[in-house]
Amino acid sequence: VADYIGDSFYLSKIAASAKEKTIVFCGVGFMGESAKILSPDKTVLMPAMDADCPMAHMATEEGIRKVREEYDDVAVVCYINSTAALKELSDVCVTSANAVKIVKALPNKNIFFIPDRNLAHFIAEQVPEKHFIYNEGFCIVHEFMDPEEVKEAKEAHPEALVLAHPECPQTVLKQADYIASTSGIIKYAQDSNNKEFIICTECGVQYKLETTCPDKKFYFTETVPVCKLSLIHISEPTR
């Protein structure tokens, strides 16, 4: 029934450019907030107000204040998967796709990345000239993805490439053939000559992958990587 399917930033941009004045955003709270920030004159409706992303709340005003007091030359970099309140307290907002580029361009030596520590560690590896201060937030799906199950999936599907989201811990990312945002994973699968992929991210992406790449096979870990707290209903993924 959706007119558009995609990640939060893509859909927020679609909402901003759409001629319609009312947007129905089927997603979690921070997604609707992001759409409203980019489209302040439009009405944004959320069908499930209790659908929420726990990670979006895993930073505090007090924590940000303490870091600003301790470091003079610090930029608070906020992941888009955060509440509007946290975005307001930050210096810049990034996506997983553009975070490395933006952090590299910042004049600040010290970077306080909120709320996700795994994405922060991934960015820090790409930008070694910066000093990162880590927040202890995490995605409840990616954080608990079992690296042993990823290994088992690779053994079960030896021809498959592993595509992982940078919100995954290092134990998973080290096994990946390619690391990217949700949109990056989809594009890689579309462009690749490979026919099989193990997907290390929330399995809601399966629909988009299978509809855009009907001739390819996608596998997930034995423990289904689904965000139950988001209340988004999906079908059982292929293992």
Show the residue positions of the predicted features.
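A generic, well-ordered mixed alpha/beta core segment in the N-terminal half of proteins
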Residues: 37-79
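Residue-level detector of conserved catalytic or cofactor/ligand-binding positions
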Residues: 232-238
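A C-terminal functional module that forms or caps the active site or interfaces directly
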Residues: 6, 177-231
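Active-site cofactor/substrate anionic-group-binding motifs, chiefly glycine-
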Residues: 4-54
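General beta-strand structural signal in soluble alpha/beta enzymes
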Residues: 1-7, 24-27, 45-48, 76-80, ...
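Active-site glycine-rich loop that binds ribose-phosphate moieties when present
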Residues: 57-66, 85, 91-106, 113-119, ...
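Glycine-rich, Lys/Arg-enriched anion-binding loops that position phosphate/diphosphate groups
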Residues: 115-182, 189-190, 201
